[in-house]
From Swiss-Prot:
HAMAP family: 23SrRNA_methyltr_RlmD. Pfam families: TRAM, tRNA_U5-meth_tr. SUPFAM superfamilies: Nucleic acid-binding proteins, S-adenosyl-L-methionine-dependent methyltransferases. This is 23S rRNA (uracil(1939)-C(5))-methyltransferase RlmD.
Length: 443
């Protein structure tokens, strides 16, 4: 017999009541933290020092969650978010906090989590890598939303904590040329006969122009392709269709791959290849990595999770003998092409799953320096082989401070000391950040 949950009267009353709280600090996801009846309460949108009126939405044994209803006493660091979809769209969650305080919060969060793994207080450099705080994204993936009642299609991003899509016509953190394409693209897609066959739309600003990849779940009619092609040529963008198997079809006149420029180098990438979305910060991040690692001609440097060569090529340009390793075959092939495009012959690339046993890999051996730029899961398995590699310096670029903190324990156990730690503000207006850590062998 099925049993249905029914909230107890007292519990329902507790959740519906509004209470006033004093916010103490922010958590690692950017939510305000307060205390109520001995419990920690998480309040998205609230800032430290504020007195807020909230409604409890969830009660657990040791904590509760609440929805911000009203700010009674605002923090001097609070600002009005310029985005009309702020609070609905799940993209930016710190637009209400001034940029200097965003950076301070991220430095503190990075230092706190790494300090716990180091079992000592770690100082984060105050000269963080940062750039423009608005219109900085050179790539974005927009979801499509087709209203079954009106048969109207909208483009947008996922709603916070939901699979629902919030329709938008511009984006304050997307590069202006891309933001200005959202509304015209939505109008165009609504003219297509096969608009029910459309998936996401990926927009990219490259050094050689604007690129759009439209995902389709079934082939489009020729008349639809003509509309798309005319739109692309009129706006001078490269437009590609991507089918279920990942196959690409150019609908525009230009067939050149997108590329970006870095340290005088040209790095091409295919749609679907990972690149850093913040081009300005990526430039500064790579420059800082070169400075911290201090590579000299002839040194053997291993670049794990190398992608299309974002760090490998600048390292090779400095005269190092570089070995790049990446788990995606297509990106390994692109990295090799990028080396050839730039006339660099002092580097080699290998494809390997860096989460598996690396004992038989031909590239695993003594090196002078190691650079890692893993995905959010980190590089725990790779770092187990430190004793075989014995690099004098390890530079770890992390998009997940929690993974960096966990992995740093392996470095400490292997005799390394954390000598520099810096914030890389790749994603302004959000709680997300990257960290750069330099470890040096003590003995």
């Amino acid at each position: 017999m099925a049993q249905f949950f029914k909230a107890k009267p007292n519990q329902a009353k507790k959740l519906s009541q509004k209470i006033a709280l004093k916010v103490q600090r922010l958590d690692h996801l950017g939510a305000g933290i307060a205390e109520h009846q001995g419990k920690v309460v998480f309040i998205p949108g609230a800032l430290p020092g504020e007195t807020v009126e909230v409604q409890l939405t969830e009660q657990k044994k040791n904590y509760a969650r609440a929805k911000l209803q009203r700010v009674s006493e605002a923090s001097p660091d609070r600002q009005t978010p310029p985005c009309p979809w702020y609070g609905k769209c799940g993209g930016c969650d710190l637009q209400h906090l001034s940029l200097p305080r965003q950076l301070e919060y991220k430095r503190q969060a990075l230092g706190d989590i790494v300090s716990r793994s180091a079992a000592q207080t770690v100082t984060v450099n105050t000269d963080e890598v940062s750039g423009d705080s608005w219109h900085y994204r050179r790539r974005a993936r927009l979801a499509t939303l087709l209203d079954k009642e009106t048969n109207q299609l909208a483009l947008g991003f996922r709603e916070e904590g939901s699979k629902s899509v919030v329709g938008i016509d511009s984006c304050a953190v997307l590069a202006r040329p891309l933001s200005e394409l959202i509304s015209p693209f939505a109008t165009l897609l609504n003219r297509l006969k096969g608009k029910q066959r459309l998936g996401h739309l990926e927009l990219t600003q490259a050094a050689n122009g604007l690129f759009a990849v439209l995902r389709v779940t079934a082939p489009l009619a020729q008349s639809d392709k003509k509309l798309l092609s005319a739109f692309a040529d009129e706006r001078q963008i490269a437009l590609l269709l991507q089918g279920n198997e990942g196959e690409l079809e150019f609908l525009s006149s230009g067939h050149e791959l997108p590329y970006y420029q870095l340290d005088g180098l040209k790095l091409a990438f295919a749609p679907g290849n990972f690149i850093q979305v913040n081009g300005e910060v990526n430039q500064a991040m790579v420059a800082q990595a070169m400075n911290w690692l201090d590579v000299h001609a002839g040194e053997r440097v291993l670049d794990l999770f190398c992608g299309v060569g974002n760090f490998s090529l600048p390292l090779a340009k400095q005269g190092a003998e570089v070995v790049g390793v990446e788990g995606v075959p297509e990106m390994v092939a692109q990295a090799k092409q990028n080396a050839a495009i730039n006339g660099l012959d002092n580097l080699s690339f290998y494809c390997a799953d860096l989460s598996e046993d690396l004992a038989a890999e031909p590239w695993l051996g003594k090196i002078d320096k190691l650079l890692l730029d893993p995905a959010r899961a980190g590089a725990y398995e790779s770092l187990k082989w430190l004793k075989k590699m014995k690099p004098a310096k390890v530079l770890y670029v992390s998009c997940n401070p929690a993974s960096l903190a966990r992995d740093s324990v392996l470095l400490f156990e292997a005799g390394y000391q954390l000598t520099r730690l810096g914030l890389v503000d790749m994603f302004p207006q959000t709680h997300h950040s990257e960290g750069m850590a330099l470890f040096e062998l003590v003995n």
